[in-house]
């Protein structure tokens, strides 16, 4: 817990926004939360691979778990409207000079195929598999398997505004010395300095404007609000993430 974290939460409470223990519960809005950490006390990132896959790969209890790295998914194989496998290849960027890298391989599924390639990658895999908007697939020369016009449709990245502020924070309460090169990164790693487990983000907010805010933003905003947000009370319009830079 940092001094800034407590001060920020105190300030937002004065504006009427409560502190919420889990702001990522898909329901809460108009509140603030202490930032959750994915860095362990020894400075190691606690990602999916290190916390889930690696332990199971080395516990000798999951012989059916195989992880294929440096590879690319080409498409999902579909038979009679059912996903039955995945076609993939070794990524040529990591296997230069290897003739086998150009050969496509197939893994069959007995139960389920899960496509989890992110907001940008997943639609591409589905479309290469023939699942998507017929017009898009026709232009790309991909045979239509299932008509799903919503695949990749109207995806919009979020907008970002950055505002710098002067503060009374002490130098050790920010990343300024690290970003400015005044700290020896090698020494920090060797000594497992706690600053390496901190991304300078201590708190986050999910917010929706009130009626006065909406009216002040003009008729175009009002129209967009009424269409996309008014009837969805758990959909935030903006997030605030202070960074102690």
What are these regions (language model features)?
Residues 1-79, 83, 163-166, 174-180:
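Conserved redox-cofactor binding core of oxidoreductases
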Residues 9-13, 53-57, 126, 134, ...:
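Non-transmembrane alpha-helical segments in soluble domains
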Residues 59-63, 92-97, 101, 131-145:
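Secondary-structure transition/capping motifs at alpha-helix termini
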Residues 70-72, 110-112, 116-123, 129-132, ...:
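Glycine-/small-residue-rich beta->alpha transition segments that form the dinucleotide
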Residues 78-79, 98-99, 124-128, 137-139, ...:
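Short, solvent-exposed loop/turn and secondary-structure capping segments
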Residues 87-99, 207-213:
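Short acidic, glycine-rich loop/turn motifs
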Residues 94-117:
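Core beta-strand elements of the Rossmann-like FAD/NAD(P) dinucleotide-binding domain
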Residues 123, 133-245:
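Mid-to-C-terminal "cap/lid" subdomains and adjacent gly/pro-rich loops that border
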